[in-house]
């Protein structure tokens, strides 16, 4: 297991050299969605603790390594940091450790969600992913549906195309229609086949991004900290966690600003005129009040 201590003491992830172009995959999504089981399917071994229940087993970020067709793969599993109730005193540490394990940045973020169960919690998880990693993170996102076996005779494309879940349709569009499905109980040829399908999507994504990975200021800070070497008890680590808090807050503000701008763009012209008219009315009322106050002061005081 690739622990945080292995990383902070200068160990290289999986013993990979820079020339081997290791693929870094970050698992994201709401608690209990099957991230750990998906990680095990990716690595084709029980690397992460996984149980068949709707609650998260993973308590801290964990990285495991494997290979696919000769290429080294680093898979990072995440604790419950992508939900509104996850705001607690350990949040900064959980996010900071996730950045450290995935530095200098992930090539792919796998958003794991259960087939036919994309709920408000999943929508919140997507928003939290943007807050934690920045608004540009969707450029490197692939949606991965678990419970592929539930499709029965229907194809995944049919399911996605004809779903009446608007939030899911919007997400798929935002991710450039990059999606696939896993049966995490599969083995042998079935497991190999679904993994090959995902890796084909990964190659397409890497071509679109010209081989780049997702990065931001916080990943640069994490990389610097790793390069310098440190202890989790040192002042440098505490300063890093303070930076985590600042950067996530900044990214949250940028997301809210972007959403506000988007709302104005998609408002119908009539609605925009209503907003403008409403603002004008308020200014008119304010101007009249000021006039009467000035008139009263001028003639009666």
Curated annotation (Swiss-Prot):
Tissues where the protein occurs: Expressed in thymus (in thymocytes), spleen (in splenocytes), lymph node and, at lower levels, in lung. Highly expressed in T lymphocytes.
Protein name: GTPase IMAP family member 3
Stated family: Belongs to the TRAFAC class TrmE-Era-EngA-EngB-Septin-like GTPase superfamily. AIG1/Toc34/Toc159-like paraseptin GTPase family. IAN subfamily.
AIG1-type G domain: residues covered: 20-223
Binding residues for GTP: 29-37, 50, 147-149, 184
Keyword Membrane: yes
Record-linked Pfam families: AIG1
Known role: During thymocyte development, may support the positive selection of CD4 and CD8 T cells. May play a role in mitochondrial DNA segregation in hematopoietic tissues. Binds GTP.
Factors inducing expression: By BCR-ABL oncogene.
Stretches assigned to the Cytoplasmic side: 1-279
Topological category with respect to the lipid bilayer: Single-pass type IV membrane protein
One GO CC term on file: mitochondrial outer membrane
Intervals, Lumenal compartment: 301
Record's keyword terms, sorted: Endoplasmic reticulum, GTP-binding, Membrane, Nucleotide-binding, Transmembrane, Transmembrane helix
Keyword Oxidoreductase tagged: no
InterPro entries noted in UniProt: G_AIG1, GIMA/IAN/Toc, P-loop_NTPase
Native organism: Mus musculus (Mouse)
Stretches that traverse the bilayer: 280-300
Gene encoding the protein: Gimap3
One annotated GO molecular function: GTP binding
């Amino acid at each position: 297991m690739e622990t945080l201590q292995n990383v902070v003491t200068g160990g290289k992830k999986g013993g990979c050299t820079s020339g081997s172009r290791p693929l870094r995959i970050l698992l994201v999504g709401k608690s209990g969605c099957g991230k750990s089981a998906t990680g095990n399917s990716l690595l084709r071994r029980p690397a992460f603790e996984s149980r068949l229940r709707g609650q998260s087993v993973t308590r801290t970020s964990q990285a495991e390594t494997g290979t696919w067709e000769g290429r080294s793969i680093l898979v990072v599993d995440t604790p419950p940091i992508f939900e509104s109730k996850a705001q607690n005193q350990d949040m900064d540490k959980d996010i900071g450790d996730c950045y450290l394990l995935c530095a200098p940045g992930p090539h792919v973020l796998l958003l794991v969600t259960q087939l036919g169960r994309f709920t408000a919690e999943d929508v919140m998880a997507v928003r939290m992913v943007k807050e934690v990693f920045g608004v540009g993170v969707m450029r490197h996102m692939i949606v991965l549906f678990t419970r592929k076996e539930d499709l029965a005779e229907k194809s995944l494309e049919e399911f996605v195309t004809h779903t009446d879940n608007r939030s899911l349709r919007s997400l798929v569009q935002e991710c450039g229609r990059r999606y696939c499905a896993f049966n995490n109980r599969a083995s042998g040829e079935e497991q190999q086949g679904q993994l090959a399908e995902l890796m084909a999507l990964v190659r397409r994504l890497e071509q679109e991004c010209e081989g780049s990975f997702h990065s931001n200021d916080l990943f640069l800070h994490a990389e610097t900290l790793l390069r310098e070497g440190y202890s989790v008890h040192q002042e440098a680590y505490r300063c890093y966690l303070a930076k985590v808090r600042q950067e996530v807050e900044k990214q949250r503000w940028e997301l809210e600003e972007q959403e506000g701008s988007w709302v104005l763009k998609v408002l119908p012209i009539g609605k925009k005129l209503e907003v403008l008219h409403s603002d004008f009315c308020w200014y008119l009322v304010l101007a009249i009040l000021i006039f009467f106050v000035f008139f009263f002061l001028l003639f009666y005081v």
